[in-house]
Design a protein with these regions (language model features):
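ABC-family P-loop ATPase nucleotide-binding domains
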Residues: 46, 55-112
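ABC transporter nucleotide-binding domain
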Residues: 141-227
Length: 257
């Protein structure tokens, strides 16, 4: 769906990168096929021009300069904004006269992120986009992405382990486990369906006896249980505390189940 930012979440080995590679035509699926507007994506330049995937892998000749890579990208992605790419490189402190092979892990990620933010296609897939970036560069990336997204409607699909960082950015959550989609829901609706209860072990156990528990933590004499459902705050005893779950904690409990 266009004009939406998705978070693709899953544990290591869950199949996130494989799924993105299949969707973007990098590899062929064992069964089934990926279509866009009724046309198969794999080995279809017309459809592939509507899709871009940024990942850890470099698809450019390593001896190529960053500036030349920008020009090269425009040959395939005709709406690539080279002027904006140069401007973003300046913001991130990326020298465009550097060869790609000389870039550090962080600046290699920045180079690929700039490409992703300037290709101007309907579907942009970002696989671990902030790998190697320091806190300042990560914050700059999220800000620039939101600014670009606001003025250029597109679907952004972000696959990342930094769930807490992206939780305020993404609008739709997709969680996969063992190669299958566990859930797909808007972030707000998802977080409204779960909550946590904290208090003494006995008080929490009494409250949660008839609830749908998805996980629990115990520290000393205190216990927290994580519950699927909507709390009736009028019936909450005074000796327990009800709080909303954050996305990272919910992800951990759902994928540990």
């Amino acid at each position: 769906e266009s004009n939406k930012i998705y978070g693709l979440l899953g544990r290591n080995g869950a199949g996130k990168t494989t799924l993105l590679n299949i969707i973007t035509g990098k590899i062929l699926a064992d069964q089934g096929k990926v279509t866009l507007n009724g046309k198969e994506v794999f080995e279809n330049d017309e459809m592939l021009r509507k899709i871009f995937m940024m990942s850890e892998r470099n698809y450019y000749p390593e001896g190529m300069k960053v500036s030349d890579a920008f020009r090269w990208t425009k040959e395939f992605y005709r709406k690539f904004d080279e002027k904006k790419a140069v401007s973003l490189a300046e913001q991130f402190g990326l020298r465009t006269d550097r060869k790609i092979k000389s870039l550090s892990t962080g600046y290699g990620s920045i180079f690929r992120l700039i490409i992703a933010l300037c290709v101007n296609v309907p579907f942009v897939f970002l696989d671990e986009p902030v790998l190697g970036l320091d806190a300042n560069h990560r914050e700059l990336f999220y800000r620039v992405m939101i600014e670009h997204y606001s003025g250029n409607p597109a679907a952004y699909i972000i696959s990342t382990h930094l769930i807490e960082e992206v939780s305020t950015v993404i609008e739709e959550v997709i969680i996969i486990r063992n190669g299958e989609i566990l859930l797909k829901e808007s972030r707000e609706d998802l977080l409204d369906k779960y909550y946590s209860v904290t208090g003494s072990i006995s008080a929490v156990d009494m409250y949660a006896a008839d609830k749908q528990i998805i996980g629990e933590d115990i520290l000393g004499g205190m216990k927290t249980v994580y519950i699927e459902g909507v709390p009736d705050r009028n019936s909450v005893p005074a000796n327990v505390e009800i709080t909303k779950m954050d996305l990272q904690k919910l992800f951990i409990k759902l994928t540990n189940a």
